[in-house]
Amino acid sequence: MDPKTSVVLPALHLVDPQIQLTTTRMEDAVVHGQNNADLKVYPIILRLGSQLSLSMVRRNLDSLEVRVFQSTPIVVKMTKLATTEELPDEFVVVTAK
């Protein structure tokens, strides 16, 4: 994992245990998404207590590192209010665990 990317803090509860979330700044996320096909970048807006589904915008089916999620959305739920430091620019990078 890129040392510039920080692991997600407990503000997020991941429903699917096979998915791992990391947070990064928007500029870094875009660069990672272009340079590493294993990373999926999603803009998200989190609201306390709400659930949101993140659809896969692209899949790299040739990579053995990437789990194929088929039609099941990735569901993330806020469990506490997050600061901008915890969720910089409200972007997350979703990678296969």
From Swiss-Prot:
Keyword hit for Membrane: yes
One CC-aspect GO term: membrane
Keyword hit for RNA-binding: no
Cellular compartment(s): Host cytoplasmic vesicle membrane; Host cytoplasm
InterPro entries for this protein: Protein_9b_Betacoronavirus, Protein_9b_SARS
Domain 9b: start-end pairs: 8-97
Membrane topology of the entry: Peripheral membrane protein
Keywords assigned: Host cytoplasm, Host cytoplasmic vesicle, Host membrane, Membrane
Family annotation (PROSITE patterns): SARS_9B (PS51920)
Assigned protein family: Belongs to the coronavirus group 2 protein 9b family.
Miscellaneous section: The gene encoding this protein is included within the N gene (alternative ORF).
UniProt subunit comment: Homodimer.
Protein name: Protein 9b
